[in-house]
Design a protein with these regions (language model features):
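C-terminal accessory helical subdomains adjacent to catalytic cores in phosphodiester-
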Residues: 1-7, 12-146
């Protein structure tokens, strides 16, 4: 029988990522005895993983506004999805909020579109998001051991 692994990927908006990961690992040690378990925490939001590859953004959105990325700190605790909205959405965050009337379902649709368009252009080795790198490294280690 092949070795099983559980890989959990989740957003982390407010917690210290290392403390949060350790809390999750402690719970896993107590409850999941025989399975390899990895927690990959997207620091702040999953959009941080998209912002980790600027070339993928430019390929998906050639008219993206680079000025919004100048001061972005990768995996920093900041308004990540809002920065992405200002970068790629026509009219930026304010236009998206106005058009969606701040309804999460409409904002969620925009986020899904960004993930689809940018995601297909991501180059795994070039993504500079530390939390994304951790995720990829964990996957690669498990694939290599097969």
């Amino acid at each position: 029988m092949k070795q099983a692994a559980i890989i959990v990927v989740l957003d982390n908006d407010k917690r210290d990522p290392e403390v949060f990961r350790q809390e999750l690992e402690n719970v896993a040690k107590e409850t999941v005895k025989l399975t390899d378990c990895v927690f990959c925490v997207a620091v702040k939001e999953m959009e941080a993983w998209l912002l980790g590859d600027e070339n993928a953004i430019w390929e998906a959105y050639p008219s993206a506004k680079k000025k919004f990325l100048r001061d972005y700190e990768q995996d920093g605790i900041c308004d990540t999805w809002q920065i992405l909205a200002n970068t790629v959405y026509a009219g930026g965050l304010s236009e998206l909020q106005k058009k969606s009337q701040n309804r999460y379902s409409e904002i969620g649709k925009a986020k899904c579109e960004w993930a689809d368009k940018i995601g297909v252009n991501l180059v795994l080795e070039e993504n500079i998001s530390p939390s994304f790198r951790f995720f990829i490294n964990e996957l690669e280690m498990r694939i290599a051991s097969e």
